Amino acid sequence: MNIVVLVKQVPAISDIEIAKDNNLVRVGAPSMLNPVDKHAIEAAVAVKDAIGGTVTILTMGNALAGEMMRDGIAIGADKGVLVSDERMAGSDTLATGLVLAKAIEKLGGADLVFTGKRSTDGDTGQIPPAIAQRLGMALISYANSVSVDGTTVTATRLNHDGIETVQAQLP
């Protein structure tokens, strides 16, 4: 089972500074692993421990993202891949989704892709559906728990009526 976890380097929550134009000050600001991405890594590692496979952390960013990726490896991921190019600095979610999907393809594809719900710095939540669409994969969003049995992924998530169980076939 080849599992990819998308992670993001975000400004440290305790040190967020807002510029006069209402954008986050990123230059020189301390950064950290997006907190909800930690849960995605933990879920991916739990699946790997249950059925075997490899967990690869994938991120797009500058060289400083390497430190953040070490945190993910400490949680239990097997390796990390950083996609970095100055031409991608400040890219929007459309470009980011395309680059990350192409990176997953270059890595040989993925049986499962885990992400956090959204990043603390952008809060758009657009990357998971963009990746699923580009890779032709099913998307199970807002999962609280995940399990894999044979060729089926089962997840539970909260909805307006309580707890919902959803399933999707592995590629």
Describe the residue ranges of each PLM region.
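N-terminal glycine-rich FAD/FM-binding segment characteristic of electron-transfer flavoproteins
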Residues: 1-171
